[in-house]
Amino acid sequence: EWRVSQLQIRESLIDNIGEDAIRRFLRSRGIEKKDLGQEFKYFVSNAVGIDIMEEEFEEFCYNHLMYGKRKLVRVFEIANKRKITDDELWLKALKKDFLWDSLNMCKILKTDVSSSDDWKVASVKTVDDKRGEVESICILFQCYIRVTKKISKDHEWCTYIPVEVDLK
């Protein structure tokens, strides 16, 4: 029986996570690639939404992109955190700059960048403390990159930039 998922997984997402990591994830769910002629992105697209839930795969992508092997860690001390613990200020800034309307939403599978729209938010997750103030916020940015070369062909791809702000 031939089944086709409506979701199309982008090759850039596979490149950023790594085909091996995605294979291991799918294999742990009992899903193996059987059609040797099928491109990997089509295999993943068909598996997501048919064999596994879209939300489960998106959570895997989020964890891998935020905390996986490609993460660069920099630590800064924030002198005055009072102004940046307000949910409304974060939401206002995200809405103004990225048309983002939630402090807890993941759209990794549906966010795509291009040369004309090169910087987007793919996910935001916040944790509030007992007083309702932001304790931590994780923002996953998706960025379009184009490298122009004089001699050879230009290269373009997208990358994900994880930012975690811990205000404890």
Segments predicted by a language model, with ranges:
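Intrinsically disordered, low-complexity polar/charged tails and linkers
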Residues: 1-163, 168
